[in-house]
Amino acid sequence: TRCSVVRGLGDVYKRQDTDSLTDTDSKFSASTDYYGFLDADESAWYGSQQQGVIKSVVQLGIMNGYTDGTFHPIGNITLSEAIKMAAVVHATCNNQTISFSASDGGKWYDAYLNYCVKNRIVSSDEYSSLDAYATRAQIAHIFAKATSDFAVVNDIDYDYIPDVSERSEYADEILALYRAGILTGDERTRAFRPSDTITRAEAAAIISRVALPTTRIKIV
């Protein structure tokens, strides 16, 4: 069953054009045209001439740019932004609606946080500040909880990832995403760098592989 992308409050969408993004194995369908961004180099690894991950997540309505026409591909993702994206992914795959009400409070992300808490993606007191930059491990944890569509394409264990062990925080989620071909780690060392922050382009790569199974990567 294909799901329609749920559009959240405050997101900016352009005219529909769904012809340029197809994945018969995906639960997602494209709903937004892609025109590029002023600061996104289409010849870079994330660009439409290479992996095209920013284009994919924008077309699917999971991520969007800023009103000044930029995307900030090398800017870091905050926890609140990650929670918003996880809520959209989960709602899309489960045919649910993210509801907005005055009781949500004054922060733009409150409805998304409430949705994620209700659906056990995160707990209400899991993070001390949602304005903090998300780590790579936290991103793995959040998106592993947002969807369960993780068919194994890489038969690997913890010994494949040099800086993650069974005792590492969010170890199970990190390994699950490696095994699913959603995470690949450093091309040379295979390291995941779980404590590092993550850029918007890197997050787009993870999210596009979550949404589009045919883009997942077999590494062994």
Cite the ranges covered by each PLM segment.
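A short amphipathic alpha-helical interaction element
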Residues: 54-57, 86, 116, 174-178
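Single conserved hydrophobic/aromatic residue that forms the stacking wall/gate
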Residues: 1-16
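Non-catalytic cell-wall polysaccharide-engagement segments
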Residues: 200-202, 207
